[in-house]
Amino acid sequence: MANGKTSFGYLLPTREVVMAPGVPDFGSMIDLAETAEGYGFDSVWCGDSVLARPRLEALSTLAAIAGRTKRVKLGTAVFLPALRNPVILANEVANLDIISQGRVILGVGIASKTPAVQKEFEACGVNFRYRVSIFEEIITIMRRLWTENEVSFYGRHFQLDGVTLGLKPVQKDGIPIWMAASAEKPQRRMLQIGDGWFPNAKSPEAFTEGWNQIEALAKESGTDSGRLHKALYTTLNINEDKAQAEKEMREFIEGYYNMPFETMARTQSVFTGNVAEAQAWLKGFIDAGTETMVIRFSSPDQAGQLELCSQEVLPAVDS
């Protein structure tokens, strides 16, 4: 994988380990991250939610993994900045970049409009109605704190007067920020304040359609779409037994999101099938221009899926 044109990431099951009975097995997350690095994966990722979909906290989990890995990038897929204070968050992410020696990628989103997420924002003291403008101000503030010596900012939600963040990231231009932008308004926002496009495209055709729209918006606004890194978040279950793969996918999606599988499958990138079919599925996205694929496995056998994917699927699609 390190020799190919495409980068591959593994999303750690930080929600599943919390959903399981008993005390969450954090050690298994470390083991899986080390295994992924050993298999040649280029990055490991953690999701984010405080209340709506409980899981291990992303940044502290990645900090622990940073101490046990040497090469893999460490990313969030995806993080919800609007739930945090921008100065504290900028400091925490810069600290993670220092711990990992410059390996952090921040995949971010504005949060889905569901009752559980709205309740989560309310409990965290954030007005859900203003989450987009809060998000925009936080991204702008963090970028400036990471790269400027003294920052003054007077926005609708946050005001800073001559603030200096003494803890700067190792990455001199700041932390790369990828955005899950699938519609026109988020895509326009991404062109202004993002570094990468990180959709959950349901097919290679949808990925191509989305990117074509971004290029058109960039041309219209006079911005450079070529600077954006093109990534994908996708969920796989690789199994020669198609029926078993579909059963595990349905159980995973419905348990994870507390929503019907059919509802989520209409908009999310999900695949079930054997090795050859998985190769064809991923190759389609590579041909569509995907530069990084972040893979989530919808299986209770995470180690088995990780091995099967790395040994039999990925070498064939990225040669």
Predicted feature locations:
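N-terminal beta1-alpha1-beta2 module of alpha/beta enzyme domains
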Residues: 1-68, 173-175, 296
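Short, acidic/polar
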Residues: 23-36, 89-92, 179-189, 274-284
